[in-house]
A protein has these predicted regions:
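C-terminal polymerase-core module
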Residues: 512-519, 523-575, 742-790, 794, ...
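Conserved "right-hand" nucleotidyltransferase catalytic core of DNA-directed polymerases
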Residues: 231, 235-352, 368-372, 433-630, ...
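Function-dense linear segments that define catalytic or interfacial modules
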Residues: 337-341, 402-432, 449-456, 610-694
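Extended two-metal-dependent nuclease catalytic cores across DNA- and RNA-processing enzymes
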Residues: 2, 24-25, 75-254
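Active-site-proximal helix-loop-helix substrate-binding element of RNase H-like nuclease domains
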Residues: 154-158, 164-182, 335-469, 480, ...
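Active-site palm subdomain of RNA-directed nucleic acid polymerases
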Residues: 468-480, 484, 804, 808-829, ...
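Conserved catalytic core of nucleic-acid polymerases
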Residues: 493, 601, 605, 610-613, ...
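Conserved RNase H-like, two-metal-ion catalytic cores of nucleic-acid enzymes
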Residues: 5-6, 10, 16-55, 71-72, ...
């Protein structure tokens, strides 16, 4: 049986994959879809072919001998998209990591190298498969050389195969004659001119009849139609040059070592690292199970028995260590301690080794440390007390600041990104098992997982801090993010009291109103139907009731919120449907959902996250209290459910227009600054200027529209977006925005500068140095680029506002503690803070809260704070 070689046209397959696979990026912001598609095609080919040799050829950027012959060769091609260009070196690195031979040569195209190597291999009796999306390579097909043309589709990769006989069957000419057909008809993609006036049909007929261009010219007098004869007669030189341009050079002067192209194990440790970095998780399954085995494990020590665990604690004397409780869903499975990257211990919880015992010993250990390192300081604070003055390093928060675009910050990513090491991930160790089940079924794997996590923390800490320093974010980390951990930990511990009876009453109100809406909707529709079914709703609205602008998709008419909102002003039934949707969501999420979140102490203990959003805003989960609706009355009423404990009141403080005030400060626009300094109604002032109306004559509608413009500008709103928000024409929206920038010219200059700076630096930056990468700005896609520009404009403003809120939280909490007040900060929602205050401290705490929030940042305009109090959150807001 003959040996086989597979030859891949690198740029061609990469290009085909780029346009065939939807856009993908990894958590670093690197575009990966072309590499992903290329590898899928390559693996499919290798699985089918099982070759003995493999080589990938790439084009070079220098001109080739064809350019020297014809300056305009390939001159009509658009420049390579930046998203694809950045993937070419990555693709080469991945191939090299797999041990795959890459060939390229100045002055020659990949086609020439493939043709040359194919000839060598065929001469040695090998079977050859050439993989390319370029049909020019069909001229290389023989009985031993097969051309394979992949087509990337959503359903997978389909491949067309061509031996010499297949080319004849499909194109009526032999592979060698295929060159002449292309030379006569020309090729717009390569800008090969061909013979003017001769298309594919005429060219094919001529070559079928005469076998070559040379023979066609030898029988020129016989050629019909007359126009073809005349064109050939007048463009002889063009025909000859086009044939030379179209002919693949099969004797390129390259030194090719066939033995070096021998296919060995592609699934190397180096390739594994690349797959993890690119986040091609499904490709990791191709690697052997022992790929995750690591020499580091010789430094891991696991202790199960009480006496050996006690001996560990008794002998521990390090002043620096990584410490973390390994737990899941409230159950502690053990304690991981790494005093260096060569001494990692895991102390299991069970039997005589109780959670309380581990907490007691961990407390003593932490008290003796000068530097405490952990992947989750907030989680650790549930088990041990740590003073805010201790030198603490939270590796997750540090990693988040360095790259806030990631979805999660796992220890294996930290090892890869910071240490350049490959360590097994949780999936590698546990598969799909949850922690609880793994504790029973794979205890040793769970122990390794805890050790790897502790190892990565202690090993990465110095580099993390160095990178924060290099990126100018060490102060942000030290003075905002780390102190905030203690604030959030206390807030989670305190929780907020929820009144079950009030929650049931609220649910009953919603149920009653939902029933009223159902009845009214059915009456207006003339029949009952499933309001929650988009398909049934679409039929009612756009077929039965004949509403305009129905957009039909494969599954029926679109009944998305934006579609219904445009219809609502003219159709009462649509307004009711929108309200019905809002109320049913309120009932399921809050009336029903919150009841499940009330702990035995009668309070809801939400989890606050500081490593989730790209802008630096805090988010909350289980439950998400950030999304409590405020625009509709029934939505606001949910706040009545939240009440203070006996003898206490709620004090609520809300920043007034913080993002606009930040915009005024950062832009330095004198008109906006002056309006705030004179405590004027900023929306009314804007309306007066934008709509050229005397201040006293500004209507409520004009003020609302001006408010939409003010806040829309902060979010980089487009004329289209504003027109949708205000239900006006795009031209009117353009006029509003233009008038706005005439009123506040400094803002226009500032926003333009933000975009320019972000393009140059690759990131947007807040007043406090927080960075937000904006890879979308380098996209060749207009929509993506526009999105990136909006991010570049918004992130510095929204991020600065988020930083100010965090500073305010720290100041408030530290002052409450310093003055030993009974009142506690218990909740943060966007620009709003909620304190559960002792009744006898109410007035003092209101003053304290306002003072600390106002002085959280030194801006060119005052940070105004609205402070209210009440016997529930609704009253206090």
């Amino acid at each position: 049986m003959s040996e086989k070689i597979v030859l891949i046209d690198g740029h061609s397959i990469l290009n085909r994959a780029f346009f065939g696979v939807p856009p993908l990026t990894n958590s670093e912001g690197l575009h990966t879809n072309a590499v992903y598609g290329f590898l899928n095609i390559m693996f499919k080919i290798l699985d089918e072919e099982k070759p003995d040799y493999l080589t990938v050829a790439f084009d070079r950027s220098e001109p080739t001998f064809r350019h020297q012959m014809f300056d305009a060769y390939k001159g009509t091609r658009k420049p390579m998209a930046q998203e694809l260009r950045e993937q070419v070196p990555v693709m080469k690195e991945v191939l090299q990591a797999m041990g795959i031979t890459i060939v390229e040569k100045p002055g020659y195209e990949a086609d020439d190298l493939l043709g040359t190597i194919a000839g060598m291999a065929e001469a040695q009796g090998m079977d050859v498969s050439i993989i390319s999306g370029d049909r020019d390579l069909l001229q290389l097909a023989t009985d031993k050389v097969k051309i394979r043309i992949p087509k990337t589709k959503r359903t997978g990769t389909e491949i067309e195969d061509y031996y010499a006989a297949d080319v004849v069957e499909r194109y009526q000419v032999t592979p060698k004659e295929f060159i002449d057909v292309k030379a006569l008809m020309g090729d717009s993609s390569d800008n090969i001119p061909g013979v003017p006036g001769i298309g594919e049909k005429t060219a094919t007929n001529l070559i079928v009849a005469y076998k070559s261009i040379e023979n066609a010219y030898a029988h020129l007098e016989e050629i019909t139609p007359k126009r073809a004869k005349t064109n050939l007669e007048e463009h002889y030189d063009m025909a000859q040059m086009s044939k030379t341009l179209a002919t693949i050079e099969v004797h390129a002067p390259i030194e090719f070592d066939m033995e070096a192209a021998k296919l060995t194990d592609l699934y190397t440790p180096e390739a594994y690292v690349y797959m993890k970095r690119l986040e091609f998780k499904n490709m990791l399954t191709r690697f052997s199970d022992d790929m995750s085995q690591n020499d580091l494990e010789k430094y891991f020590h696991v202790y199960h028995e009480l006496d050996e665990i006690q001996n560990f604690f008794d002998g521990f004397s390090a002043k620096e260590a990584a410490v973390s409780f390994f737990e899941d869903a409230g159950t502690v499975y053990g304690l991981a301690v790494a005093e260096s990257n060569q001494n990692v211990a895991y102390l299991t919880c069970g039997g005589f080794v109780t959670e309380g015992y581990l907490e007691e010993q961990a407390q003593k250990l932490c008290d003796g440390l000068d530097t405490l390192v952990t992947p989750d300081l907030k989680g650790l604070l549930k088990h041990v007390r740590v003073t805010e003055t201790k030198n603490c390093i939270d590796t997750t928060i540090a990693a988040y600041l360095l790259n806030p675009l990631k979805n999660e910050y796992t220890y294996d990513d930290l090892a890869k990104d910071i240490l350049g090491q490959m360590v097994p991930s949780q999936v590698d160790l546990l598969g799909k098992l949850k922690i609880k089940k793994a504790a029973d079924e794979k205890p040793e794997a769970l122990e390794l997982l805890a050790c790897y996590q502790a190892y990565t923390c202690i090993a990465a800490k110095d580099q993390l801090l160095e990178q924060l320093e290099e990126h100018g974010m060490k102060k942000l980390y030290d003075e905002i993010e780390m102190p905030l951990v203690f604030v959030l930990a206390d807030m989670e511990k305190e929780g907020v009291r929820a009144e079950k009876a009030e929650l049931e009453n609220y649910g009953a109100q919603l149920t009653g109103r939902i029933a009223e809406l159902e009845t009214s909707i059915y009456e207006k529709a003339g029949e009952t139907f499933n309001i929650n079914s988009p398909k049934q709703l679409g039929v009612i609205l756009f077929e039965k009731l004949q509403m305009p602008n129905g957009k039909k998709t494969k599954t029926g008419y679109s009944t998305a919120a934006d579609v219904l909102e445009r219809l609502a002003p003219d159709y009462p039934i649509v307004s009711e449907i929108l309200e019905y949707r809002q109320l049913t969501k309120l009932k399921s999420t809050y009336a029903d959902g919150l009841a499940l979140c009330i702990a035995p102490d009668g309070r809801i203990h939400s989890t606050f996250n500081q490593t989730i959003t790209a802008t630096g805003r805090i988010s909350s989960t289980e439950p998400n209290l950030q999304n409590i609706p405020i625009r509709m009355e029934l939505g606001r009423l949910i706040r009545k459910v939240f009440v203070p404990k006996d003898g206490y009141v709620f004090i609520d403080a809300d920043y007034s227009q913080i993002e606009l005030r930040v915009l005024a400060h950062m832009s330095g626009d004198q008109n906006l600054i002056a309006a705030y300094q004179h405590a004027e109604d900023i929306h009314r002032i804007t309306a007066s200027q934008v709509f050229h109306t005397p201040l006293e004559d500004v209507t409520d509608l004009q003020r609302r529209n001006a408010k939409a413009v003010n806040f829309g500008i902060v979010y980089g709103i487009s004329s289209f977006g504003l027109s949708q928000d205000l239900s006006i024409t795009r031209k009117e929206a353009e006029g509003y925005i233009a008038s706005y920038f005439e009123t506040y010219p400094g803002i226009k200059t500032f926003l333009d500068r933000l975009v320019t700076d972000a393009k140059e630096k690759g990131y947007a930056e807040t007043m406090f140095g927080r960075r937000r990468p904006v890879p979308e700005l380098s996209s060749s896609n207009f929509m993506q680029r526009s999105f990136g520009e909006r991010i570049a404009m918004n992130s510095p403003i929204q991020g600065t506002a988020a930083d100010i809120i965090k500073i305010a939280m720290i100041r408030v909490k530290q002052r409450l503690d310093r003055e030993q007040l009974k009142s506690k900060l218990i909740l943060q929602v966007h620009d709003e803070l909620l304190i559960e205050a002792a009744a006898d401290e109410e007035e003092y705490v209101k003053t304290l809260l306002a003072e600390e929030m106002r002085h959280a940042a030194d801006l060119a305009v005052t940070l105004e704070v609205d402070v209210q109090s009440g016997k529930n959150w609704f009253e206090a807001h």
